[in-house]
């Protein structure tokens, strides 16, 4: 079965490889039953690739530099899975939340979930909370654990990996997609502009996504469920619904969609 990886900046809509224009894209989307797909949902940049070969099937404004927002977390997760492949950590590795982590979790202006200082969280739980509810605090917890609380080192790793993969128009300034200044001093890289958003393109995200799924397909077991629960049966239990409404069982579920990261 052919796997298709779609990278859409601004919206995820139904695509077909035979499309010839952006207008046709919107017409086909609405004709497929997605009547809510008004002009406000038109993707600003789009790239559709064959997930088996990496061949480009459709593109529009694929090389325009944009802020990937929460899709930035996919690069952090890529490095986490790389660390697991090297035996540096495992899904069962325990990370104990710090008072700083709890303080970040309490910043409601950015996407977060409840994290309590002193509570143990497995890497698997942190991956789930990073991928599904798009938690900024769990993203930072993973990055900090792997760099001994050195945010600059993690950003260096993100940027080095991007160059290695051939992502020529990408620059990371934070680990999660939220500008560092939004963390109110609890996450402050010293060699990177704390007010700067991350920069990438649809093409670069497709390169990263293609390599991620090829090398570490287990990420999809975290991203393919419409609802997930962490720390079940404990006082810290939380249940999250996916923001990727194309996942089977979600609002606009499509058979075969296995997710990865929304923006």
Across the structure, where does each feature detected by a protein language model lie?
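Short, well-structured active-site flanking segments
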Residues: 82-100, 216-225
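Penicillin-recognizing serine hydrolase domain
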Residues: 29, 33-34, 40-41, 147-263
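Solvent-exposed, polar/charged alpha-helical surfaces in well-ordered, non-transmembrane soluble domains
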Residues: 55, 78, 82, 124-128, ...
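Second-shell loop/turn segments in exported
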Residues: 36, 60-68, 110-117, 124-129, ...
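Solvent-exposed coil/turn segments that connect beta secondary-structure elements
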Residues: 51-53, 61-63, 83, 98-102, ...
